């Protein structure tokens, strides 16, 4: 399946303007997707070279980074201002800088769970999964009721192919969910972790809470709801797959395409259609959203196929 425009008889019900930071109300990544990531974009520093050989760049400082840096300089022992700067840097794809900023905060606040969560989150984007796992484990020890810490710990474990542990973390995160949005998000990753662990019956049971009356509040979670209905057999792959993004500035379209393509690709792996899955994963990694979970997951699957 190519990334060229195709007609699939399916449209998004709504669009949402994404905020600047990842954690404000949901697990949205769209706020952190740059409009360009190659040399043609007027990029900042090189962040990483992916395992597939692609150079992934930061974006230059914007007003948010400049202001946050000034605020921290005025009060360098403020955890709140450390987090403000780290999030502003991450929004400009400055992940290495964000990790360094969080580390600076941990030097004077070594028992702050939010700082461990923030650093672990950014390490995931840098593909530093083991350091991320250690930081996120520490966050859960310091704040046992922090849903975001378990959620991101589950991602670290999942990307390390520790699927049983990932399922346990997502199950714990889901138990802490206080909204349908969190229930939907955690259920998706719990399901895929259990399927990758070979626990098909448990995975099916994990979807039992996703009944027709479970509706998303944040409109960007609509594609997760559709994925869950696909897993339940209520929608076909053709119906659930969104069109490719309209262009490099179509951030919401990119996130939706990557997330659903990765989910459907995973489904095809479960059903022994690896060649079809690989086609979807290759489409994802052609895109711009190199920090989205669907992009990272697709990248890892392609790398595993080369082993």
PLM regions and their residue ranges:
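Residue-level recognition of tetratricopeptide repeat
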Residues: 87, 121, 155, 192-194, ...
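N-terminal leader/linker segments that initiate helical-solenoid repeat arrays
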Residues: 32-80, 84
């Amino acid at each position: 399946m190519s990334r060229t425009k195709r007609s699939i008889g399916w449209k998004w019900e709504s669009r949402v303007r994404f905020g600047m930071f990842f954690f404000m109300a949901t697990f949205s990544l769209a706020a952190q997707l740059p409009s360009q990531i190659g040399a043609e974009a007027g990029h900042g520093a090189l962040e990483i070279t992916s395992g597939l050989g692609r150079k992934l760049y930061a974006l230059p400082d914007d007003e948010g980074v400049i202001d946050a840096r000034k605020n921290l300089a005025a009060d360098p022992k403020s955890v709140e201002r450390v987090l403000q700067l780290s999030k502003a840097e991450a929004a400009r794809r400055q992940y290495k800088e964000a990790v360094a900023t969080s580390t600076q905060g941990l030097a004077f606040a070594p028992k702050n769970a939010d700082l461990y969560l923030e650093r672990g989150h950014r390490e995931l984007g840098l593909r530093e999964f083991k350091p991320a796992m250690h930081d996120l484990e520490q966050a859960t020890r310091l704040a046992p009721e922090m849903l975001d810490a378990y959620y991101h710990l589950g991602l670290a474990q999942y990307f390390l192919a520790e699927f049983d542990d990932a399922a346990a973390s997502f199950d714990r995160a889901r138990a802490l969910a206080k909204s349908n949005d969190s229930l939907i998000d955690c259920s998706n990753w719990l399901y895929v972790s259990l399927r990758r662990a070979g626990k098909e019956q448990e995975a099916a049971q994990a979807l039992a809470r996703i009944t027709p009356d479970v509706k998303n509040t944040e409109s960007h979670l609509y594609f997760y709801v559709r994925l869950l209905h696909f897993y339940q057999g209520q929608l076909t792959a053709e119906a659930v797959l969104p069109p490719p993004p309209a262009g490099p500035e179509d951030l919401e379209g990119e996130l939706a395409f990557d997330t659903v393509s990765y989910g459907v690709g995973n489904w095809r792996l479960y059903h022994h259609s690896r060649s079809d899955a690989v086609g979807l994963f290759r489409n994802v990694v052609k895109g711009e959203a190199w920090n989205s979970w669907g992009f990272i997951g697709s990248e890892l699957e392609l790398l595993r196929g080369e082993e």
